[in-house]
Amino acid sequence: MKTLNDLFEETLKDIYYAEKAIVKALPKMAKKASSEELASAFTTHVEETQGQIERLEEIFGILGKPARGKKCPAIEGLIEEASEIMKEAEDDTVRDAGMLSAAQAVEHYEISRYGTLKAWAEKLELDDVASLLDETLEEEKATDLKLTDLAESEINLAADNDDEEEEAPKPKRVAAKKKK
């Protein structure tokens, strides 16, 4: 890569790969979710992500480039983390909290990438491309806010209540540790 344009195109390939990987992972997460609201959020985001993939394909077309991805180790790591949570969490509500956290990590990655791509598109005077990237950026921010609201209003509370129920017989040991 020698120019900002080269870097822009490589990063575009990265996020294209990421979106394609996300659209495959979300249905698995929806299936594992015990919360109907969380499952619905994941399912809704699949549809939104498919629209974002189409928007990226439109951007590649504007640039006169083929729409193709470039392996993205960052998204693979985030998806692997979600997979581990789905396998290892023994409690449904804890699994939901972990999957929601993993989904937000993905959202934050996407927000970072789309924000950077938009800024570069503006610098490169690719106004149509910047507008399309901004549309996706705003969708990602909105999804992150929805996930935060869901975490704070339901998912984390349910997981925390399960912890309290399991740990209720142990308050004397906790108090003894504090005195030391």
Q: Where on the chain are the PLM-derived regions?
A:
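Amphipathic alpha-helical hairpins
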Residues: 1-180
